[in-house]
UniProtKB/Swiss-Prot annotation:
Organism whose genome encodes this protein: Streptococcus pneumoniae (strain Hungary19A-6)
Entry keyword NADP: no
Name used for this protein in its record: ATP-dependent helicase/nuclease subunit A
Organism phylogeny: Bacteria, Bacillati, Bacillota, Bacilli, Lactobacillales
PANTHER family: ATP-DEPENDENT HELICASE_NUCLEASE SUBUNIT A, UVRD / RECB / PCRA DNA HELICASE FAMILY MEMBER
Enzyme Commission number: 3.1.-.-, 5.6.2.4
GO molecular function: 3'-5' DNA helicase activity; 3'-5' exonuclease activity; ATP binding; ATP hydrolysis activity; double-stranded DNA binding
GO cellular component: cytosol; DNA helicase complex
CC cofactor: Mg(2+)
Quaternary structure and partners: Heterodimer of AddA and AddB/RexB.
Bridged cysteine pairs (disulfide): none
All residue ranges annotated as the UvrD-like helicase ATP-binding domain in the record: 26-488
């Protein structure tokens, strides 16, 4: 097919006008049309969230194919494999549709070929392209095409450790061993070993892997900061900072004296304020840096007098307290800044003094890193196994050094397209440059969504082009896609309100102006005031809520707040759970979130990437089993195996065995003691009774068989033998969350199999690999099991990128930013290279023996401080972008959830805004998202912000206030029995029919340790024949029951189940105020308070309730309310007589009267029945349990038991 020319600028403008004047319901924007059809130059599309960038890419590709370009002539890079597959699917549909629409035979044939070639097109991640490239051209570097990827983190760590120790030994024994020893000690820390150095080496290596040429960067940039260090310039900068700080302090104190000080006349602190003003006043234009430093020292010294209270306003007058507090707060802020500057003077002096020593240390580090990088590179070549970054490095090496290969790709690719360009790193950017001919790049992204700095992505790659193309269109075309087709106007307005005031070039790396603001474009979503974004704060005032570390088993106020809103959405507005997303910046609080959702029965689906696989109990048991098989002399692992469910040794048995020491041995490990016990070769052999001896023999025989089996079989076979021999796989399947536990065990076998297929063999090496992963505080990804279909989504903000949800809750707004990077011993920068903390040994000059002669001082190098400042700004910018991504996931409504003391938050004061932005110090001193949001709320109170904040206290978060999840079963109707007891009897009967005698005998043992309810105990232990008369769906008609031939009811009228009526009746009986005279009117008012639907309330017969209180029992209750206990929970330890296993019974007693020597127990039943004896038989066992619990609790034997039957038109009270 002959190439069709691309559109000129004039033709594009006409197309834009025609689109604007068309009658289409969903029109392309002018910018979208420009992005689709512009050609002949490099193009950067800055596409805000929800602006249709994927649509634009697909349309652009389709247009190029329709003009005769081959799909093989396009290089299209996506950020994920999923995105690549989605783009291919979209292109397949568009190409197919185009083929059907066109009458041009040549075009049909051409597009048909493109459709056939689509699976082989260069559409995918950069990693997938480089793998294919190296497979084809790797021979140029002597790399075999059958190389494999080191995707397994544990295998990679194993190789790294081996290489590290080889290089370490070479340097430790080499010619420069003294300087290397100094390097080693510098990072030794408390461990005083090589682990500190190893940690920093791996950190630097990961950084190097993101550069286009690691060895070149090490050579050219690693020491750059030391080479260009300018201490004179740093001192001048510091002097300017001191000047500004002293002027700020002077302004603050003068304002205080002129305005507020008269309220505190003759206060002692005012004299010191004047002293400081005199000190600062002594400075003039001629003052040098020494003079400023001297004044700073005097000022700080004055502030520290009187135990630091020399400048404190200690007024106790109630009416002046706010004024005094405001002064003291600002004074603390000012002097904190002065204290930091005073410290910086000292640090700068030490930095200059030890600069030469630190530089020497850095050179030693550079040498070690160079050797490590090369040795690790060679080792991976020997294994023919590479990391993804290695593949990219070799691809770049081939493209740079073999012009014929580079030129063939540059000629082949008509266009080099890249999605998510803001998350590109330098190695990827270099590759894109080499594949392009210099003017055929199409880059799509949004710098506001660059959130992968931890993967070495550099948003400045995007930003540099954005600025350059904006200033000089000849360099390239900049196109802005600002219209948002995803979210409601309420979501977009709130997002704009936040980032207009938060993000600029200084803090945020871009100025959030009209080029970046979101524009509402989804006309299908009409404005709705109910969808105004909400900033919800759990008020911690006077709640006494414990710190997070103490609340692992407690539902946090924050989560109860969220659950209340979720239930409101679900039950009042009919929102499906799957329409709700909970976003977190990290998974550190996920356990609390999952616990809270589980407590309220809310289904949840996680992102499936919790890296806690090795922490799961069933995997830990198996790992200890493998450790014992490898080496039974490991006491901890051996005890863990013996105590595990596979063998079940208890503490008493282990204690008896641990005393079996041979007489002639001083110390023996546990395994040797087990051998002694078997041989009866100990003076304490009398402790080994027959049952224990048999149990020990079985254990030792099985362990010996496993150890023998391990010598001749694969790890995979060994693991499955263990599962099968001890039924462990089946056992964990019966535990709570059984399918997930079995999936973990299955994955362990698969991971062992993969390990042995990767040229690593044997149990010892597998255990060593696992231990190294744990030692490095890493873990393996947890196994994902099938999630529920309708469930709330819980995921990190990173995982949510590219997704959208109608309702979004951003949780943990109060969670502090992670600043671990800035606390490291090493901080790297592309511009400055290595920043390091140098450990200097200093003479103290002490003469006395009890004083140390030398001390160690940690001195951050000048480059370290510069890199630290750079890192802080980059980190805050990334956190802002993370919040932007989170807020723009919402389609309809956005909730921002945090917590804090209302009193403290509302008393906070902030500096005035500048140019419509929060003060830069306010932004840089924020510890979390909440600090930013709250500051905006306070500073811009006069602005009509498009989000509101609301404090929610404990009184609004009680169980009653939150409510319960309403659950309904289609099998239940009003004719069925009280479902608290009988809703699973059918399943129980079917299960019992198939149960074997052994399982029946040991039923409690199988279930235990567990907690049972009375109805569960009844189901498990009462004879099946005693349940005669209970109607069970699908089990046939009960005797005397008439068969109905009525047509089924397909009406939409709300169905009311027996379970709902039963629950509502119990709640009503609990709520009735027995201190007042009971009337129909008072019962009606009480019924309104019951948490249920009106349809259920209408089914409750209040006359029948009133009639109960006319019975003998009812009158006794009314006359003895001071002896009455209602809805009382209990728990009781029971023993199963057949298996002799203990278990716990828990339940709730409807009510009882407690007298001195007698208890009257009663229980309400709403079951339908023919004869009272039916219910008496049915619930006899349950009441017997209640009776036993009360008898044990109060030591009273005389207990009367009554059933109050409400299932007929007339109430009946039956004594049991």
């Amino acid at each position: 097919m002959k190439l069709i020319p691309f559109l000129s600028e004039e033709e594009i403008q006409k197309l834009q006008e025609a689109e604007a004047n068309s009658s289409k319901e969903q029109k392309k924007t002018a910018e979208q049309i420009e992005a689709i059809y512009t050609s002949g130059q490099n193009i950067l599309v800055s596409a805000s969230a929800g602006s249709g960038k994927t649509f634009v890419m697909a349309e652009r590709i389709l247009d190029q194919l329709a003009r005769g370009v081959e799909i093989s002539q396009l290089f299209i890079s996506t950020f994920t494999v999923k995105a690549a597959n989605e783009l291919k699917e979209r292109l397949e549909k568009k190409i197919s549709k185009k083929i059907q629409e066109t009458d041009d035979v040549d075009l049909k044939q051409h597009l048909g070929r493109q459709l056939a070639d689509l699976p082989n097109a260069a559409i995918g991640t950069m990693d997938s392209f480089t793998q294919k490239f190296l497979g084809k051209h790797g021979y140029l570097l002597d790399i075999a095409p059958n190389f494999r990827i080191l995707q397994n983190q544990s295998e990679q760590l194993l190789l790294e450790n081996e290489v590290f120790h080889e290089v370490f030994e070479a340097h430790y024994q080499g010619k420069q061993k003294e300087t290397f020893s100094h390097l080693l000690k510098n990072f030794a820390g408390r461990g005083k070993d090589e682990r500190g150095l190893r940690q920093q080496v791996y950190k630097i290596y990961d950084f190097l892997q993101s550069t286009s040429n690691p060895q070149k960067w090490l050579s050219d940039s690693f020491l750059k900061g030391f080479e260009k260090a300018d201490f004179t310039s740093e001192k001048e900068k510091l002097t300017e900072q001191i000047k500004q700080a002293l002027w700020d302090l002077e302004s603050f104190f003068r304002y205080h004296l002129d305005n507020d000080a008269k309220e505190f006349a003759k206060a002692a602190y005012l004299e010191n304020v004047q002293l400081i003003l005199d000190e600062i006043g002594s400075l003039n234009q001629e003052s040098d840096s020494q003079a400023y430093q001297a004044v700073l020292a005097h000022v700080v010294a004055i502030s520290k007098e009187k135990n630091g209270r020399a400048l404190t306003n200690a007024s106790r007058k109630a009416d002046l307290k706010p004024l005094a507090d405001a002064y003291n707060e600002e004074r603390k802020t000012q002097f904190a800044k002065l204290g930091q500057l005073s410290d910086q003077i000292t640090i700068l002096d030490y930095q200059e003094r030890y600069h030469g020593d630190t530089w020497k240390l850095a050179k030693t580090f550079q040498s070690f890193m160079s050797d490590f990088v090369e040795a690790y590179r060679q080792r991976k070549r020997q294994e023919n196994a590479f990391e993804f970054a290695d593949i990219s490095h070799y691809t770049i090496e081939i493209l740079e050094n073999f012009p014929q290969v580079r030129e063939s790709y540059q000629e082949r690719f008509h266009e080099v397209m890249v999605d998510e360009y803001q998350d590109t790193n330098h190695i990827q950017e270099r590759m894109l440059e080499l594949l392009s001919n210099g003017h055929n790049r199409f880059m799509v992204g949004d710098i506001k969504q660059s959130i992968y700095r931890f993967r070495q992505a550099d948003p400045q790659i995007f930003n540099e082009k954005f600025q350059r193309y904006a200033q000089n269109p000849q360099e390239g075309k900049l196109i802005l896609l600002k219209e948002n087709f995803r979210s409601s106007s309420e979501v977009l307005s709130a997002t704009n309100d936040v980032f207009e005031r938060l993000m600029d070039q200084e803090v945020g790396e871009i100025n959030y102006d009209n080029k970046h603001q979101l524009v509402f474009a989804n006309t299908k979503l009409t404005p709705n005031p109910d969808n105004k974004a909400e900033f919800l704060l759990y008020d911690k005032d006077d709640t006494g809520e414990e710190e997070e570390s103490q609340t692992e088993t407690k539902l946090t106020g924050e989560m109860r707040l969220v659950i209340k809103e979720i239930l409101k959405l679900h039950q009042e507005k009919g929102v499906a759970f799957k329409e709700i997303a909970l976003l977190t910046s990290s998974r550190s609080r996920n356990d609390q979130i999952l616990l809270a959702l589980s407590e309220y029965g809310i289904p949840v689906k996680t992102d499936g990437e919790q890296n806690n696989y090795l922490q799961s109990l069933e995997v830990q048991v198996m790992l200890d089993t493998l450790r014992v098989i490898h080496n039974p002399l490991q006491d901890y692992a051996l005890v863990a195996l013996m105590k595990s469910p596979m063998f079940g040794f208890d503490e008493d048995e282990l204690a008896r065995l641990s005393l079996q020491k041979a007489e002639d041995k001083v110390h023996e490990n546990l395994y040797e003691k087990l051998v002694n016990a078997q041989k009866m070769a100990s003076s304490q052999k009398g402790l080994i009774h027959t049952a224990l001896a048999e149990k020990l023999k079985q254990f030792m025989d099985i362990l010996a068989s496993w150890r023998l089996y391990a010598k001749t079989h694969s790890l995979y076979d060994l693991i499955w033998k263990i599962y099968n021999d001890r039924f462990y796989y089946d056992y964990v399947g019966a535990l709570p969350n059984g399918p997930a536990r079995q999936a973990n065990l299955y994955a362990l076998a698969l991971r062992a199999d993969q390990f042995e297929k990767s040229n690593f063999k044997g149990l010892p090496r597998f255990i060593r690999m696992i231990d190294q992963v744990l030692e490095a505080q890493h873990d393996l990804a947890s196994v994902v099991v099938a999630p529920p279909k309708d469930a709330v989504e819980l995921m990190t903000i990173h995982k949510s990128k590219g997704l959208e949800f109608p309702y979004v809750f951003i949780l943990n707004m109060d969670q502090d930013f992670n600043k671990q990077d800035s606390m490291s011993e090493v901080i790297l920068s592309r511009q400055n290279g290595l920043g390091v903390k140098y450990i200097a040994k200093m003479e103290t000059g002490a003469v006395e023996d009890h004083y140390p002669k030398t001390i160690k001082l940690s001195i951050p190098s000048l480059t370290y401080r510069q890199n630290e400042e750079e890192l802080q700004l980059a980190s805050y910018s990334e956190q802002m972008r993370l919040l932007y991504v989170a807020m723009t996931r919402a389609e309809k409504k956005l909730y921002l959830v945090g917590k804090g003391s209302r009193e403290k938050l509302e008393s906070k004061e902030y500096p005035a805004a500048k140019n419509g932005k929060l003060n830069s110090n306010t932004r840089l001193q924020a510890r979390n998202f909440q600090d930013w949001l709250w500051a905006i709320s306070k500073v811009f109170t006069k602005d009509k912000l498009n989000f509101s904040y609301r404090f929610i206290g404990e009184d609004q978060l009680t169980r009653e206030a939150i409510g319960e999840l309403e659950t309904k079963s289609p099998l239940q109707d009003s004719s069925q029995a009280d479902n608290r007891q009988s809703d699973t009897i059918k399943e129980a009967l079917e299960m019992l029919k198939e149960v074997e005698v052994y399982n029946t005998l040991h039923r409690a043992a199988i279930e235990l340790p567990s907690v049972q309810t009375p109805s569960q105990i009844k189901k498990f232990y009462e004879p099946v024949m005693d349940m005669e008369g209970v109607e069970i769906a699908g089990q046939g008609q009960s005797v005397g029951k008439k068969i109905s031939f009525d047509l089924p009811d397909f009406s939409t009228k709300e169905k009311v189940t027996g379970a709902e009526i039963g629950s509502a009746t119990h709640e009503l009986m609990q709520r009735i105020d027995l201190s007042q005279q009971l009337t129909l009117a008072s019962l009606t008012e009480t019924l309104k308070q019951v948490q249920t639907s009106q349809a259920v309330r209408d089914k409750i017969n209040l006359d029948k309730i009133l009639a109960f209180f006319d019975t003998v029992l009812g009158q006794e209750i009314l006359a003895n309310t001071d002896h009455l206990y209602r809805e009382q929970p209990f728990s009781m330890l029971k023993r199963d007589q057949k298996s002799q296993e203990d278990f716990v019974v828990r339940g709730i007693l409807d009510g009882y009267l407690l007298y001195e020597n007698k208890i009257v127990l009663f229980d309400y039943k709403t079951d339908r029945y023919d004869e009272p004896s039916q219910l008496v038989d049915r619930y006899r066992g349950q009441l017997a349990l209640y009776e036993e619990a009360l008898s044990r609790a109060y030591s009273i034997e005389n207990i009367e038991k009554y059933l109050i039957l409400l299932g007929k038109d007339e109430v009946q009270v039956v004594k049991v």
